[in-house]
Each structure stands twice: as structure tokens, then as C-alpha cells.
């Protein structure tokens, strides 16, 4: 499976992942809203939104 693998401040990149899932998580801090994408479906801290999917 190919997932996007980057933070919102970086150029988009992709990565081949063996986990079978991708994630997109977002949170806000002093820099604004940060979006991060990657492989698998990690646990997140309270206040972090996450979406896990088979292709995102």
C-alpha cells in the first residue's frame, strides 16, 4: 500500500507501507493547524484528531 508520509509544512511525499492502513492526524498549536500523514494507525494524545483508512 502507498501512503502519503509528510507534515503539512513539507512537500508531499509517498511511502510504500506494509501495515495496510494510512493515517491523517491533525492538531493545533502556536504554529496553527498541523496535519501529518503516514503509515499504520497510531495511538494519539488527547486533542489530536486522527482518521485511519485503506487509502487516504
From Swiss-Prot:
<dbReference type="GO" id="GO:0099106">
    <property type="term" value="F:ion channel regulator activity"/>
</dbReference>
<keyword id="KW-0964">Secreted</keyword>
<keyword id="KW-0528">Neurotoxin</keyword>
<dbReference type="Pfam" id="PF21947">
    <property type="entry name" value="Toxin_cobra-type"/>
</dbReference>
<dbReference type="InterPro" id="IPR045860">
    <property type="entry name" value="Snake_toxin-like_sf"/>
</dbReference>
<dbReference type="GO" id="GO:0090729">
    <property type="term" value="F:toxin activity"/>
</dbReference>
<dbReference type="InterPro" id="IPR054131">
    <property type="entry name" value="Toxin_cobra-type"/>
</dbReference>
<keyword id="KW-0872">Ion channel impairing toxin</keyword>
<comment type="similarity">
    <text>Belongs to the three-finger toxin family. Short-chain subfamily. Type I alpha-neurotoxin sub-subfamily.</text>
</comment>
<comment type="function">
    <text>Binds to muscle nicotinic acetylcholine receptor (nAChR) and inhibit acetylcholine from binding to the receptor, thereby impairing neuromuscular transmission.</text>
</comment>
<dbReference type="InterPro" id="IPR003571">
    <property type="entry name" value="Snake_3FTx"/>
</dbReference>
<feature type="disulfide bond">
    <location>
        <begin position="17"/>
        <end position="39"/>
    </location>
</feature>
<keyword id="KW-1015">Disulfide bond</keyword>
<keyword id="KW-0008">Acetylcholine receptor inhibiting toxin</keyword>
<dbReference type="GO" id="GO:0005576">
    <property type="term" value="C:extracellular region"/>
</dbReference>
<keyword id="KW-0800">Toxin</keyword>
<feature type="disulfide bond">
    <location>
        <begin position="3"/>
        <end position="22"/>
    </location>
</feature>
<feature type="disulfide bond">
    <location>
        <begin position="53"/>
        <end position="56"/>
    </location>
</feature>
<keyword id="KW-0629">Postsynaptic neurotoxin</keyword>
<protein>
    <recommendedName>
        <fullName>Frontoxin I</fullName>
    </recommendedName>
</protein>
<dbReference type="GO" id="GO:0030550">
    <property type="term" value="F:acetylcholine receptor inhibitor activity"/>
</dbReference>
<feature type="disulfide bond">
    <location>
        <begin position="41"/>
        <end position="52"/>
    </location>
</feature>
